[in-house]
């Protein structure tokens, strides 16, 4: 990043923080804060200034406004002395339960596609927290990270004292880590929810798909699994309609059906080449597990700006997620024209418009210029004096 580009981004961030009112996190006096600044080394050598505490939300606001950070964070933990220079001296008082969803850990693709995919993961997670874990949704704070994902903060007091091992159990359940598909079927009872019913639905859809395909194709797919030959594959294929019925009436009886069913299901749920396994993984939530188990984590400050995108870190109510579009709702800047220089061609959407960026110099809206410069896709070439 050229110095002029860094200065341009910091100027835009300064304008934002001059006007923005950032709501402090709850119990602000018990939170540690950390910041990354636009110093001469940024972004090649990033260093965080942490072990910072504030006595009030106004003090936090004034600090951010005067120093204009590139990135702002606060602790998910509560401390008696958050500004103490060592973790041992802070005196840990508990921590919010956090789930981090980051598209970069799930897929590669366009920024727009990644944002759409991770929104689906957020909706899936919220459904699990509400309908399977019984968490009071009024205690959940949902935040768009400003980058490629969402942070789900569970501030229910019952979880605040959980140690890493207890948090691990929760995130393992959410992510489906260590589940036993055969046990899920064996233990199934009418009305049972959670992974038992999720796996039943996954298996039902998988068998329904097999039932629509040519028998030759089904035999080839099943017989490719270890321990499943052509004869067994053909016999299993003939049983699919009956198995679908059982999955909808008495799933626990399926594994008692006969050895063919046990062998094929065993291979489908364990063999690396199984075409069922991706569907099981898709039924899980793709959360970043280490974030949940870390009881001293720093996480992005809602209302701040993310200097790798120029987007706002947006807090929202759970009910607002469905209509939230980060490519519109998280954009902090407007239409004033700036000049950028790009060494490559790019295509993307922002603020409801599609942009095709050619190589070379180009006038673009400020929102587009900040986005491209923050992501390292362009350098600033100038700001038009006549723009308003």
From Swiss-Prot:
Name this polypeptide is given: DNA primase small subunit PriS
Gene Ontology cellular component list: DNA-directed RNA polymerase complex; primosome complex
Record-linked InterPro entries: DNA_primase_S, DNA_primase_ssu_euk/arc, DNA_primase_ssu_PriS
Function, as annotated: Catalytic subunit of DNA primase, an RNA polymerase that catalyzes the synthesis of short RNA molecules used as primers for DNA polymerase during DNA replication. The small subunit contains the primase catalytic core and has DNA synthesis activity on its own. Binding to the large subunit stabilizes and modulates the activity, increasing the rate of DNA synthesis while decreasing the length of the DNA fragments, and conferring RNA synthesis capability. The DNA polymerase activity may enable DNA primase to also catalyze primer extension after primer synthesis. May also play a role in DNA repair.
Disulphides: none
Active-site residues per Swiss-Prot or TrEMBL entry: 100, 102, 288
Assembly information from the UniProt record: Heterodimer of a small subunit (PriS) and a large subunit (PriL).
Family: Belongs to the eukaryotic-type primase small subunit family.
Keywords: DNA replication, DNA-directed RNA polymerase, Magnesium, Manganese, Metal-binding, Nucleotidyltransferase, Primosome, Transcription, Transferase
Gene3D superfamilies: DNA primase, PRIM domain (3.90.920.10)
Cofactor(s) named in the record: Mg(2+); Mn(2+)
TM regions (residue ranges): none
GO molecular function, one term: metal ion binding
